[in-house]
Every structure is written in structure tokens, then in C-alpha cells.
Amino acid sequence: MADPDGCISAKLYRGVADLLVEDGYAAKGYTWIDVDDCFLAKRNLATNELQADETRFPGGIPALAEYVHSKGLHLGIYNDIGPGTCAGDPGLNVSAVPDTRADAQLKKDAQTFASWGIVSSVGICVF
């Protein structure tokens, strides 16, 4: 990571959460923080589950979600319905024609996001 203090990281999003509360934005309804691309490492090879980049997110996304929620805020996260995100991280890889493998993987990824205590937004990046 070229600039660990300026790149997407738990440190950055914790700071955003602090500012939303301390500067009064949360009281005015700004209660959502959305993590964009570049939060993922490669899938866990043993389980095929999505996993956060441990360098950027020590303790993973659940630790960040717990911090954000402790401030009375909500945490959302971006992913892509294709094989990869625009930055090349793993996507949800749902085929255009549903099959049991794609459906099972999508369900597993949704369960992973739910276990992290977050909401996922899904886009599509054609690259």
C-alpha cells in the first residue's frame, strides 16, 4: 500500500465515523458510511469466503462495523456482481443465467456480509 494513511482502511473509516458524530452530521441524519472498492483480499481458498485485506482492515470488517455501530451509525460496503470489482478485487461472480453454483456462492457471500454486521450494495463493473 503506497499511502496507508490516505488509502481505504479501517483507520480512515473510523475517522469518518468520529467526524460525523463530533461535527454534528449524524444528528442531522448523515448516519451511513459506505466502504467502496479495495477492501477485499482474495477469497479464502479453503472456504471460498470473501475476506477483508488484513493490512488495511486489521481485525476485519466486523471490527470496523462494531466501531461504526457503537457511534450510532450504519456501515455499508460495495461489491460487484461480476467476477471482479473495478479495482480487480473478487466480485460476487453471479452469472447472467442462474445456476446452482452461482446461487449458492451469492447466498454464501450474503451470509458473510450479514455475519460482518453490514449492508452490501452491489454494482457491476465491465472491464
Segments (PLM) and residue ranges:
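Aromatic-lined carbohydrate-binding/catalytic grooves of carbohydrate-active enzymes
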Residues: A2-D5, S9-F127
